[in-house]
Amino acid sequence: MTYLLALDQGTSSSRSIVFDEHGRIVAQAQLELPQIYPRPGWVEHDPLEIWRSQLATARAALAKAGIAANAVRAVGIANQRETTVLWNRKTGQPVHHAIVWQDRRAEPACAQLREQGHAGAIQAKTGLLIDAYFSGSKLQWLLDHVPGAREAAERGELAFGTVDSWLIWKLTHGQRHLTDVSNAARTMLLNVHTNQWDDDLLALLRIPRALMPEVLPSSADFGDTAADLLGHGIRIGGVAGDQQSALFGQACFTAGMAKNTYGTGCFMLMHLGARFQTSDNGLLTTSAAQLAPKPGAGSGQAEPALAQRAYAMEGSVFIGGAVVQWLRDGLRAITSSAGIEALAHSVPDAGGVMMVPAFTGLGAPYWKPEARGSITGLTRGSTLAHIARAALESIAYQSAALLQAMGRDAVAAGGAPVSELRVDGGACINDLLMQFQADLLGIPVLRPAVIETTALGAAYLAGLSSDLYHSTDELAQLWRAERRFEPRLDRARAQELMAHWEHAVRQATAR
């Protein structure tokens, strides 16, 4: 049997999973990762703790699997995106805590860029909106606020990377300073048409090019792990940002296929194929995981400009499963997150109650930072069960709004709306939520047999570059649905419910 090791470095934990060649989980290990909150709106990680926890889980997963490192064909890395690390090339020590993707400290600099009229040019090159979410503005802040950082960067003494780059650096004992196109595309510094760092964007944010890692396709040779770390050197063969990795792990390889990850928030991606398309409906365009060129197509897989182009439309919901956490921890309405399904199931519907969980504003496709959470439609007959059901349904409403926006963009480009939605993430195990999602969308919702699709995507990318697999067609044959939720609701009723939702959104933003 041949094995693959996936490192899944997330915001709240570091995990490692050993997969067999059929994409089945053999063993896994996980450690929580603490977040640091220096002041309101600021979120940081200790980069050394990211590294220590990830290495520890990799060793633990191999031990649980009962295999030696030389039985592993390749390592794949999936990581939280946008989180920014800056370190000293000589010592390998970070010069500051990592600035996490949720961190908003760079918003004033982003507002200045918008006021200066750069939004159109940046979106045309990167597919992104100007926002503190993305790495470029975080890196600019570090260079401007860490004493001596800008001068050291200009002397070539520092290295920048998203979490994947940091892990590759540590895994190879500083021999490789690399990233992949899907992570690079989240920096607001990569021209996604050329897969190269854009000199104009670097100059605009005053970022020395010497800081930047080399960009490779997502399935490529990222070097070998140092032999002393895992007991044997293993090729790092696949790297992707977590959401693009999940899209790959869901076997969404062709235009029009889509997945939604139901976690603390929700992340929906629709594959665009090789066609770059900006959204007219509040969505982002980003690079999907990209493969090395086919034989004869170029000079080698280390040339990102020659990668097989693949793009995705993306929308993010700020509050998904977090609304259940709020019911548990904030209202103490339930004792465990798992208890919400039984409570919601105790009533046939939400009884006209509508919840808009805009605790931190509304993300795509609305982009209403001023929105605040609301519960409407309450009557004397409303119960805690109705509120619980409305909270659960709010996740589906927000996701439906995303998919409808994607459908409008797809049709405008001459394509067709999404015909099925593949789902993953912790909340996808909730049958009531998945059925209501299918009812709202009017298309099947498919839950895979392996819901750890983020790690699986990284493993598949590593397997392709190491010739364990030979094509995405082969991977598509491995994908299996554990359950298929067919829509049961009359379409007129579904449209009526969505109209009620949009009315509730307008109320939540009427400030």
Swiss-Prot record:
What reaction does this enzyme carry out catalytically?
A: glycerol + ATP = sn-glycerol 3-phosphate + ADP + H(+)
Look at the named UniProt entry and state the broad enzyme category this protein falls under. Answer: transferase
**This protein's UniProt keywords:** ATP-binding, Glycerol metabolism, Kinase, Nucleotide-binding, Transferase
User: Which Gene3D superfamilies does the UniProt entry name for this protein?
Assistant: 3.30.420.40
Which residues hold ATP?
Answer: 11-13, 264, 321, 325, 426
Its GO biological process annotations read: glycerol catabolic process; glycerol metabolic process; glycerol-3-phosphate metabolic process
PROSITE patterns annotated for this entry?
FGGY_KINASES_1, FGGY_KINASES_2
Q: Name one GO molecular function term.
A: glycerol kinase activity
Question: What residues bind ADP, as annotated?
Answer: 11, 15, 264, 321, 426, 430
The metabolic or biological pathway listed in the UniProt record of this protein is: Polyol metabolism; glycerol degradation via glycerol kinase pathway; sn-glycerol 3-phosphate from glycerol: step 1/1
InterPro entries membership = ATPase_NBD, Carb_kinase_FGGY, Carb_kinase_FGGY_CS, FGGY_C, FGGY_N, Glycerol_kin
Q: Where does sn-glycerol 3-phosphate bind?
A: 11, 81-82, 133, 242
Family designation: Belongs to the FGGY kinase family.
Protein name according to UniProt: Glycerol kinase
Q: Which organism is it from?
A: Verminephrobacter eiseniae (strain EF01-2)
